[in-house]
Amino acid sequence: MTVLIHVLGSDIPHHNQTVLRFFNDALAATSEHARVFMVAGQDAGLRESCPALSLSFYAGKKTLAEAVIAKAKANRQQRFFFHGQFNTSLWLALLSGGIKPEQFYWHIWGADLYEVSRGLKFRLFYPVRRMAQNRVGCVFATRGDLSYFARQHPRVRGELLYFPTRMDSSLNNMANDRPREGKMTVLVGNSGDRSNEHIAALRAVYQQFGDTVNVIVPMGYPANNDAYIDEVRQAGLALFSAENLHILSEKLEFDAYLALLRQCDLGYFIFARQQGIGTLCLLIQAGVPCVLNRENPFWQDMAEQHLPVLFTTDALNEGVVREAQRQLASVDKSGITFFSPNYLEPWHNALRIAAGEAA
């Protein structure tokens, strides 16, 4: 049996690090198909922090793609598990036959599925990528993303799988002792990435609540984002008083981020695609309800787990938010499918499928 190779085909340090540490800590000991990785980007101490894994690093997406294609052609029994797929060369290789469908297994991260960029080169490439996606051996994704993907590619196999959010399961049913009265705190977005549409989200929050709430906007990631942070700050100050607007421009350590989320009463996410599952999971765990765009298919996953879902089109006020908090507090969070450790078994299943060990 040829050992499965995992591919992180784009240099996205935060997500790649999360995946590698998850495999090192939770999967590598029990499966030989969870140990070999090809990674676009620099080592940055990952070999040292993930000793159970065999890691090969490549300077860029193109270099990595060339190496993957060479391996695929040299051994047609070799299978690859692509985690997020932001690599144009790999899609083209799948479309042209350089990589065969039975060699190509893909875990959708969300941003790699949706066609939201307005840039010309992306608009031109999307139809090509769509054709390539029809040749994938099997996709793994959230319930909502599977539904979205199946409408375009009904013949491609799909299996439920969740991004391995770093979570302490002992906190699942820990009561949130934050007072549920008085001035509310609203978290806007899950990072400083433009895909969060911060300015539109701030306007939407203001339209719902006016200048009566504390607004927290975490923008410490990605790095070198000062111009956009200033743009968001200026737009925010045109709506909210300085004492109510909190733009966080420094990256927070995990425990500090967790503490920040537990101070919130509501999460507000205006983007129309599935993203930010990690932040959503941590908010739900802390008993904080979330507002989603109705076009974000992750609401299907939340509804399936009997979690309250608020939409950006709903009329929101403190009473609505407090009722959602009450409903969320009554949910047994230890049974939520996309929480740790429940997402582990689907990962074992995904490895068996991608490696050819399960039908």
Swiss-Prot record:
Cellular localization per UniProt: Cell inner membrane
Catalytic activity line of the entry: beta-D-ManNAcA-(1->4)-alpha-D-GlcNAc-di-trans,octa-cis-undecaprenyl diphosphate + dTDP-4-acetamido-4,6-dideoxy-alpha-D-galactose = alpha-D-FucNAc4-(1->4)-beta-D-ManNAcA-(1->4)-D-GlcNAc-undecaprenyl diphosphate + dTDP + H(+)
Group of enzyme by EC: transferase
Membrane topology annotation: Peripheral membrane protein
Major localisation: membrane
The keyword DNA-binding is assigned to this record: no
Keyword annotations from UniProtKB, A to Z: Cell inner membrane, Cell membrane, Glycosyltransferase, Membrane, Transferase
An annotated Gene Ontology molecular function: fucosyltransferase activity
Cellular component GO terms, alphabetical: plasma membrane
EC annotation from Swiss-Prot or TrEMBL: 2.4.1.325
InterPro entries hit by this protein: WecF
Pathway involvement of the protein, from the record: Bacterial outer membrane biogenesis; enterobacterial common antigen biosynthesis
Pfam assignment, any one: Glyco_transf_56
Keyword Transferase part of the UniProt annotation: yes
GO BP of this protein: enterobacterial common antigen biosynthetic process; fucosylation
The protein's role, per its UniProt record: Catalyzes the synthesis of Und-PP-GlcNAc-ManNAcA-Fuc4NAc (Lipid III), the third lipid-linked intermediate involved in ECA synthesis.
Entry's family note: Belongs to the glycosyltransferase 56 family.
Protein name per the record: TDP-N-acetylfucosamine:lipid II N-acetylfucosaminyltransferase
Species the sequence originates in: Citrobacter koseri (strain ATCC BAA-895 / CDC 4225-83 / SGSC4696)
Gene name in the database record: wecF
